[in-house]
Amino acid sequence: MERSKACPDCRLGPQRRRGDTLERMNRKGRIRHSLAYWCLNATDWQWSIDRICENAMLLGCVSVELAPPELWPVVFRHGLKNALSLNGMPDPVFARGLNNLKYHEEVIARTKAMIDQSADNGVPNVIAFTGYKWREAGDPGSGEIPKSEGADNTVKGLRELAQYAAPRNVTIVLEQLNTRDDSHPMKGHPGYQGDDIDYCAEIVRQVDSPHAKLLFDVYHVAIMNGDVIRRLRQYAKWIGHIHVAGVPGRGELDDCQEIHYPAVMRTLVEIGYTGYVGQEFIPTRDPDAGLAEAIEACDV
């Protein structure tokens, strides 16, 4: 199947034009659209923060997320919000996590520092991870942390972070990642303990705080669990943030992938979700056209 192609003389896809001036798209207002910084900057496209923000504005997005704190002033200068911040850990940020008591001191300290920065800048969410399942995060030969032990440790750490975040009006969102795709370091994460949305949801349920929720990544959930719409309804009260990408491959939200995103977005509206939807796909072609298609597919 051939991928769809954008009009060659329309660099930014379907934004309306008034003379030679690009005009911001008006959206329906039921979905709060966000662009993930790393997908456009830390990949082959290497877009600057200004270009990402300009595209976000023109597409009718309200946020650019996951940019480092030193770039937040640029995001705000463009009239955008930052829906989600990183946890302050060195790359890969998901390797050393809350499932391993050995890393608790570092992870909790760094995450608390990000909570403070987020609170000071009106950023509502900070990401969290279970981490890899090995005793030494980077060493598969070091022995595995049992899933029950990893869950207990994550509950303990997440509860402390939620208590710290609550008076600062920040929410910690725990992300499930898939462990099946080993084709690319950002398409799948073999060894990550929290690879099951049911496992992560139970952790959040046990923490029992409005400031600890799920980051429901449709791409990862579809690969590991499937039954996306049923799980959105099942875990509605615990969902704090949404990520989307094409399945499989983490590419565009086009007709070469299997998720019908308009139905997913309508489900979010039906369950009363009012958070952000972050476009976190890795472009395989002209990002301008791919982003325009993705936002259009998700604007219900």
State where each predicted segment sits:
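Cysteine-centered motifs
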Residues: 7-10
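Leucine-biased recognition of intrinsically disordered, low-complexity hydrophobic segments
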Residues: 12-15, 22
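Histidine-acidic metal/acid-base catalytic patches
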Residues: 21-60, 65, 122-124, 135-145, ...
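Structural motif corresponding to the early beta-alpha repeats
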Residues: 39, 54, 59-160, 167, ...
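Non-cysteine beta-strand/loop elements that form the S-adenosyl-L-methionine
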Residues: 81-88, 128, 175, 236-246
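Short, well-ordered beta-to-alpha junction loops that form the rim of enzyme active sites
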Residues: 129-131, 176-178, 218
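Hydrophobic, aromatic-enriched interface-forming segments
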Residues: 161-185
